[in-house]
């Protein structure tokens, strides 16, 4: 590998803006904001959705049923 062409990989704190949840992860993203997390200072990256607020992970998922061709056929001929 060539030297000095890759971005610096370092620990950063990601913060979910909708819930305030923070977690530490490695990333190449940069930020001017910093935050103290577990006694250390890290760059802060704000995200809109994380596993703490996404409906798939929280279990508050809404299921919508789209009527397809088979459903319309069954409804039309009273099969179901």
Curated annotation (Swiss-Prot):
Entry keyword RNA-binding: no
Induction statement: Part of the SMU_1296-SMU_1298 operon.
Molecular-function annotations in GO: structural constituent of ribosome
Keywords assigned: Ribonucleoprotein, Ribosomal protein
Disulfide bond annotation, renumbered to this chain: none
A GO CC term attached to the entry: ribonucleoprotein complex
InterPro entries: Ribosomal_bL28/bL31-like_sf, Ribosomal_bL31, Ribosomal_bL31_B, Ribosomal_bL31_sf
Gene Ontology biological process terms from the UniProt entry: translation
Residues spanning the membrane: none
Pfam entry (one): Ribosomal_L31
UniProt cross-references to PANTHER family, sorted A to Z: 50S RIBOSOMAL PROTEIN L31, CHLOROPLASTIC, LARGE RIBOSOMAL SUBUNIT PROTEIN BL31C
Annotated family: Belongs to the bacterial ribosomal protein bL31 family. Type B subfamily.
Subunit-structure text: Part of the 50S ribosomal subunit.
Name assigned to this protein: Large ribosomal subunit protein bL31B
